[in-house]
């Protein structure tokens, strides 16, 4: 389902933990990392597509997450010419995305990259909030910057509400 401008409707998913870190996933068999994302099927809403992709790509269901926000507008990026499949009709020149910010409310153990017969990812880790903007492939960087800027206040409020150890330096000394 490609629009008149050549963009495929898609959802992007930023999953954060209670500390304000975000899930960063490694593409299967590659050295590139990104947030989960995927196409919207005909007749499917963006939210329905998000929950489907969430399960297909990282094994999480509705009960494992809480929606904190979604982008106000659709955000678009163009594919590099070398990635455009010119022999398909209609030609897809990029993605237009609705992004969702989710908080993981279950444990990390619920994350499972192997729920699909063709997994998108083969690993993941928690990273600092702005890390993905610097690390994502260049053609997605502007969209990532806009998404993270739009969601920043929500994630920062989570961090402010997370209890901090009373004496962090003493805690480090006791452990080490």
Curated annotation (Swiss-Prot):
Record's GO cellular component terms: cytoplasm
Q: How is the cofactor bound?
A: Magnesium or zinc. Manganese can be used to a lesser extent.
Tell me the CDD domains matching this sequence: NUDIX_Ap4A_hydrolase_plant_like
| EC number from the UniProt entry | 3.6.1.-
Write one Gene Ontology MF term: magnesium ion binding
Protein's job: Master regulator of 5'-end-dependent mRNA decay. Accelerates the degradation of transcripts by removing pyrophosphate from the 5'-end of triphosphorylated RNA, leading to a more labile monophosphorylated state that can stimulate subsequent ribonuclease cleavage. Preferentially hydrolyzes diadenosine penta-phosphate with ATP as one of the reaction products. Also able to hydrolyze diadenosine hexa- and tetra-phosphate. Has no activity on diadenosine tri-phosphate, ADP-ribose, NADH and UDP-glucose.
Q: Which NCBIfam families match?
A: PRK00714.1-1, PRK00714.1-4, PRK00714.1-5
The record's family statement is:
Belongs to the Nudix hydrolase family. RppH subfamily.
On assembly, the entry states:
Monomer. No interaction between this protein and catalytically inactive RNase PH was detected by immunoprecipitation.
Any idea what this protein is called? RNA pyrophosphohydrolase
Q: Which organism is it from?
A: Escherichia coli (strain K12)
Specify the taxonomic lineage: Bacteria, Pseudomonadati, Pseudomonadota, Gammaproteobacteria, Enterobacterales
């Amino acid at each position: 389902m490609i629009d008149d401008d050549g963009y495929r409707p898609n959802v992007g998913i930023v999953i954060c933990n209670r500390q304000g870190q975000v899930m960063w996933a490694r593409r299967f068999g590659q050295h590139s990392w990104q947030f989960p994302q995927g196409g919207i099927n005909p007749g499917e809403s963006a939210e329905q597509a998000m929950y489907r992709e969430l399960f297909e790509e990282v094994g999480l269901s509705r009960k494992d997450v809480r929606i904190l926000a979604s982008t106000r507008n659709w955000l678009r990026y163009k594919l590099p010419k070398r990635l455009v499949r010119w022999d398909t009709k209609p030609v897809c020149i990029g993605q237009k995305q609705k992004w969702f910010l989710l908080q993981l409310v279950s444990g990390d153990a619920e994350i499972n990259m192997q729920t699909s017969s063709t997994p998108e990812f083969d690993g993941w880790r928690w990273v600092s909030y702005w890390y993905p903007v610097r690390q994502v492939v260049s053609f997605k960087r502007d969209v990532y910057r806009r998404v993270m800027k739009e969601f920043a206040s929500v994630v920062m409020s989570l961090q402010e509400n997370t209890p901090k150890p009373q004496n962090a330096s003493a805690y480090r000394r006791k452990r080490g």
